[in-house]
Amino acid sequence: TIIHLFGDVWQEPGLELRERSLITCAVLVATGREAEQHLHFRGARNLGISRESLEAMITHVAHYAGWPVAVSASRTLAEVWDAMDKESAS
């Protein structure tokens, strides 16, 4: 599955990696997949997607998928961002 996803699906034409990453994060937020959000929020940051863009995506998703998943995702994003800031400072 991982080989297929990252070797095939993520390489298909039509979307840039940053777009795929943001879409994936939105799906994970909408479906409440907190564990996977950690990995993909890290990946999004590594691709240069800003915290502000991810926060805006979470707010947008909240209007369609509900505020409880958005609040949870906001917490997860803060945890990931803070951890990455600490990693880069050391």
Language-model-detected regions and their locations in the chain:
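C-terminal structural segments of small proteins and small subunits
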Residues: 62-70
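Acidic, glycine/proline-rich low-complexity segments that act as flexible tails and inter-domain linkers
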Residues: 1-18, 46, 69-90
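Short alpha-helix boundary/capping elements
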Residues: 5, 27-34, 65-66
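Short, structured motif recognition centered on aromatic/hydrophobic residues
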Residues: 19-28, 57-58
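Extended intrinsically disordered, low-complexity coil regions enriched in Ser, Thr, Gly, Ala
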Residues: 33-55, 70-81
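Short secondary-structure capping/turn micro-motifs that flank functional sites
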Residues: 60-61, 78
